[in-house]
A protein has these predicted regions:
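Glycine-rich dinucleotide-binding loop and its adjacent helix/turn
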Residues: 4-5, 88, 155-225, 231, ...
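N-terminal Rossmann-like FAD-binding beta1-loop-alpha1 element of flavoenzymes
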Residues: 10-36, 212-222
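Residues at the starts of beta-strands that form the adenosine-phosphate
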Residues: 11, 34, 202, 227-230, ...
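Conserved Rossmann-like nucleotide-cofactor binding loop
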Residues: 20, 43, 160, 211, ...
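Glycine-rich active-site loop/strand segments that organize a redox cofactor
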Residues: 43-94, 186-192, 233-253, 365
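Feature captures the FAD/FMN-dependent oxidoreductase FAD-binding
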Residues: 78-152, 156-161, 280-290, 304-307
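A Rossmann-like FAD-binding core segment of flavoenzymes
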Residues: 115, 138, 220-330, 395, ...
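C-terminal, flexible cofactor-proximal segment of oxidoreductases
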Residues: 315, 330-480
């Protein structure tokens, strides 16, 4: 049996009490709206708490939302050193926890959202749909069901806990059961509480992102002091250059340094790199180890390991949104208007043209996906981008169209990041391929792309491995 909670007019339900969800609440309050933050965990930033030992790439100056700051500072809160890199635990203790306390009764913990719909309508019903409030079905820690009604919804629930499977084809491999004793999460605390699990053991790290890189560095450090600790790194691609990143060209030095250090470990043999790696099955052994049946570059292999760190990336949980009319990209499962700018097949530079409410809107008016979940399966999200998203959304919900459309993203303007899908969408690739040396130039008033903002990785191409060069004006050339 469920109970129905009525809310006052101007109520906006926010799913998730992470950095972007709490920032959304701060902006909504500032706009005179009433946020109701629904968090499944027992405190703010519950997902971040699971990787609290990891240090963020971005310094504090990019990790604090402007409206949250305005809410906190009058109560005596002091911002941390803007140039310091916080750990996940520090992000919670020094920022999210004080912010959640300031929001008070607007945040409800132990409340998991299991479904969202238009009130008294299913997805197929169009008549009287516009203007209907939303119903959010929730379950508490004791299994009690409660329905919450709100005028609008911001889904900032993130993607943690929805890891991509280890198996090939995007599907779980045989024997890949949740809770297997040899299966570690994407960011285990190798030098802390999980040290005994990895000391003197053979660990396989699977993945080609920053989570994998962080875990590999920690395992290599452990191996320096713990005999018989071995580290194998498996990736599906044929080289690891994307993971190594842009080095000194990275706008976030900590991120660039990680790639540089990892490359040195591979070259020294401290980390064994296996490329072209796809997993078919796992077979648990009686001694607690596991046999990994796989292929590398098409050749069948079997690895015997004790632990597997699955840093395979994440995918959004869309099941709870099945009754909402969404406009999502078929490739990355992000809002269709921003998807071409972040598709990891062609884009890995870490920047994106500034975008707001208009780019995040869906056919069901008043429903938004924000934060890292708005990037779907793409991995290049930054907190500051999420803060700008919810600032714009709150302005739109309050009826301030001018503010909603204004760009207030506090990140460097890096110019154009070459994304093949984005270029194709603007006709640049077609023009470049069809025009030839003396072809008709694009009209000057049609810009090739929009300036991007972000913290550039120094890597300009994605999985496709192609560097897309922007057309440039030629002086002279074959046409004189």
């Amino acid at each position: 049996m469920s109970t129905l909670t009525s809310t006052q007019a101007g109520t906006v339900a926010v799913i998730g009490a992470g950095p972007v969800g709490l920032a959304a609440a701060a902006h909504l309050l500032e706009r005179g709206l009433t946020p109701v933050v629904l968090e499944s965990g027992d405190g703010p930033g519950a997902a971040i708490g699971q990787w609290g030992h990891i240090r963020l790439f971005s310094p504090w100056r990019y990790d604090i939302d402007a409206a949250a700051r305005r809410l906190l500072e009058p109560a005596g809160w002091t911002a941390p050193d803007p140039d310091r890199l916080p750990t996940g635990a520090e992000l919670i203790d020094d920022y999210l926890a004080p912010l959640a306390r300031a929001l008070g009764e607007h945040v409800r913990y132990g409340t998991r959202v299991t479904g969202v719909a238009r009130f008294e309508l299913d997805k197929t019903t169009t008549v009287d749909r516009d203007g209907r409030p939303y119903l959010l079905r929730t379950v508490d820690d004791e299994g009690r069901r409660q329905d919450v009604v709100a005028d609008a919804v911001i889904d900032a629930s993130g993607v943690w806990g929805r890891s991509n499977p280890l198996g090939a084809h995007g599907l779980p491999a045989a024997g890949e059961e949740a809770g297997a004793p040899w299966l570690a999460g994407p960011l285990p605390d190798v030098l802390g509480k999980d040290r005994a699990r990895f000391s003197g053991k053979r660990t396989l790290v699977v993945g080609a992102g920053h989570s994998a890189a962080n875990t590999l560095l920690l395992l290599a450090e452990l191996a320096e002091t713990e005999p018989d600790t071995t580290v194998t790194w498996a990736i599906r691609g044929r080289d690891a250059s994307k993971v190594y990143g842009g080095g000194a060209a990275d706008a976030l030095p900590a991120r660039g340094t990680i790639g540089t250090r990892l490359k040195a470990l591979v070259e020294s043999g401290a980390v064994e790199l296996v490329t072209g790696f796809t997993i078919d099955a796992f077979s648990a052994d009686a001694d607690g180890s596991v046999a990994v049946e796989a292929k590398t570059e098409g050749r069948a292999v079997e690895l015997e390991v004790d632990q597997i760190a699955a840093a395979t990336g994440f995918r959004p949980d869309l099941d709870l949104l099945r009754e909402i009319r969404l406009d999502l990209d078929a490739v990355v499962e992000a809002p269709a208007k921003i998807a071409p700018l972040i598709d990891p097949n062609f884009h890995s530079c870490g920047t994106v043209p500034a975008h707001g409410e208009a780019d995040l809107a869906h056919p069901d008016e008043g429903f938004y996906i924000a934060g890292v979940k708005s990037y779907g399966r793409a991995p290049t999200f930054l907190l500051a981008t999420g803060y700008e998203q919810v600032r714009s959304i709150a302005a739109a919900l309050a009826g301030d169209r001018e503010a909603a459309d204004r760009v207030e993203l506090d990140l460097p303007e890096t110019g154009v990041c070459s994304s093949e899908r984005a270029l194709d969408a603007t006709g640049i690739i077609e023009a470049e391929e069809d025009a030839g040396c003396c072809g008709t130039a694009a009209p000057a008033e049609e810009p090739a792309t929009a300036p991007a903002r972000g913290l550039a990785t120094g890597v300009l191409h994605g999985r496709a491995g192609r560097r897309i060069e922007l057309p440039q004006a030629q002086s002279g050339g074959c046409c004189g």
